């Protein structure tokens, strides 16, 4: 995805990319490549691929969830900042909390925050299920990208979503993971929509299931990670 394609396809999802925005993303890309040689954060390093598979893919959330407002967003398992840091860079009105367990990746995220002077970004070096114990019902939107299966995501992160807020993970094709209505009831979630689309150029399938939280999460959740995985892994 070259510059012209990136600007064009962002416009199709109602994001107007100006020169500064593009230059900031280009700088982000260059820093990613530089730090990746030390910390191995991504296997995708070619510029056009990063703009498509990391930057554009991250921004697709804004097509389906209103980010043009004052709101709080948590991105867990963010890695090198996808989708949360990209959203924070282009949507300064969104207060973004990035939760990442890797100290090395958190170092990179802190560097990006400093380089771009992102006052709307908070970086937490923790596992989401540990962070969620003392940060309950906190965020308007909670998201992640390609972290794990939907049932595991639900238990890991639902406690951090405000009542009335949204859990909206970015996934590839996950329709076979969306049939557990008893699980939604257990976590006081309502599946309000499933957005399906294809990434441009590659035409690879993407899915964003959107859950609305209708009541507080039972305090026994989330459990520790090994217990969660044992219950939901096939």
Question: What are the residue ranges of the model-derived segments?
Answer:
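Class I SAM-dependent transferase core
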Residues: 2-68, 74, 104-121, 224
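Short loop/edge segments at beta-strand edges and connector loops
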Residues: 19, 45, 125-127, 193-195
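Residue-level signal for inorganic ion chemistry
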Residues: 32, 87, 171, 211
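Conserved SAM/SAH cofactor-binding pocket of Class I
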Residues: 48, 59-148, 154
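Helix-to-beta-strand junctions that scaffold the AdoMet/dcAdoMet cofactor pocket
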Residues: 91, 161-163
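Short "lid" loop at the C-terminus of a central beta-strand within the Rossmann-like core
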Residues: 129, 149, 172-176, 199
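Conserved beta-strand signature within the Rossmann-like core of class I S-adenosyl-L-methionine
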Residues: 164-174
């Amino acid at each position: 995805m070259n510059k012209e394609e990136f600007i064009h396809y962002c416009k199709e999802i109602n994001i107007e990319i100006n020169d500064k925005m593009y230059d900031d993303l280009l700088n982000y890309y260059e820093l990613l490549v530089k730090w990746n040689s030390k910390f191995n954060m991504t296997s995708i390093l070619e510029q056009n691929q990063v703009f498509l598979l990391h930057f554009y893919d991250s921004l697709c959330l804004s097509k389906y969830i209103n980010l043009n407002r004052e709101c709080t967003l948590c991105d867990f398992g963010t890695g090198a900042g996808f989708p949360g840091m990209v959203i924070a860079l282009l949507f300064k009105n969104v207060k973004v909390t990035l939760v990442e367990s890797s100290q090395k990746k958190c170092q990179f995220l802190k560097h990006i925050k400093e380089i771009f002077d992102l006052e709307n970004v908070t970086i937490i070096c923790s596992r989401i299920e540990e962070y969620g114990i003392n940060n309950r019902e906190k965020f308007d939107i909670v998201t992640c990208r390609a972290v794990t299966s939907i049932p595991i995501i639900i238990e890991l992160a639902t406690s951090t979503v405000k009542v009335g807020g949204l859990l909206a993970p970015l996934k590839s094709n996950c329709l076979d993971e969306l049939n557990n209505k008893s699980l939604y009831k257990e976590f006081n979630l309502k599946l309000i929509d499933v957005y399906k689309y294809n990434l441009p150029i590659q035409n690879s399938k993407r899915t964003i299931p959107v859950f609305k939280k209708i009541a507080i999460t039972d305090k026994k959740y989330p459990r520790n990670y090994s217990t969660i995985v044992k219950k939901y892994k096939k």
